[in-house]
Amino acid sequence: MVKIIGLDPGISKTGWAIISLNEKNNIEFLGGGTISTDGKLGTGERLHIIFEQLKKVISLYSPNEAAVEKIFVNKNPKSSLTLGYARGVVILALKITKLTMNEYDANYVKKSITGNGHADKDQIIFMVKQIVKNLSIKCHHVADALAVAICHAYTKGSCFVE
């Protein structure tokens, strides 16, 4: 059985989701959540929290593969830089736990899940609920992480929409 962790890095909230693929390539949602940090803490402390919590998630679920959403540069360079720090910590945690990282542009993830590279958060949540049966999810950070994991499964050819 293949287990994939999908990650949506962020300094305030890093979304994560774990899926498994069985022999028939059916997707099962095993778990998901957010790693939240307090904005009152220093950047270093926030990054340390993300790193330690992500290592715990990886240890608990033992995924075989990892998929991470690439960052985009927005109008605020400080926000982009801070997001880059969070992403760097996520990459480090994956490297330390010996997980191979696969990266996907946000537009590619959206297109593979919804058919629209510019889909909004509600469309992502709607589609992941269509793909993964009996899913109750409201947090867009978890939905984004789940979309990244599903995108990886589709891209690898491990899974196909029926």
UniProtKB/Swiss-Prot annotation:
Needed co-factor(s): Mg(2+)
GO cellular component, one term: cytoplasm
Single GO MF annotation: magnesium ion binding
Active site: D8, E69, H141
Residues engaged in binding Mg(2+) 2: E69
UniProt keyword DNA repair present: yes
Record's catalysed reaction(s): Endonucleolytic cleavage at a junction such as a reciprocal single-stranded crossover between two homologous DNA duplexes (Holliday junction)
Annotated EC: 3.1.21.10
Comment on bound cofactor: Binds 2 Mg(2+) ion per subunit.
Cystines in this chain: none
Binding site for Mg(2+) 1: D8, H141
Membrane among keywords: no
Coiled coil start-end: none
PANTHER family: CROSSOVER JUNCTION ENDODEOXYRIBONUCLEASE RUVC
HAMAP family: RuvC (MF_00034)
Function: The RuvA-RuvB-RuvC complex processes Holliday junction (HJ) DNA during genetic recombination and DNA repair. Endonuclease that resolves HJ intermediates. Cleaves cruciform DNA by making single-stranded nicks across the HJ at symmetrical positions within the homologous arms, yielding a 5'-phosphate and a 3'-hydroxyl group; requires a central core of homology in the junction. The consensus cleavage sequence is 5'-(A/T)TT(C/G)-3'. Cleavage occurs on the 3'-side of the TT dinucleotide at the point of strand exchange.
Protein name: Crossover junction endodeoxyribonuclease RuvC
Species this protein is from: Wolbachia pipientis wMel
Lineage: Bacteria, Pseudomonadati, Pseudomonadota, Alphaproteobacteria, Rickettsiales
GN (gene name): ruvC
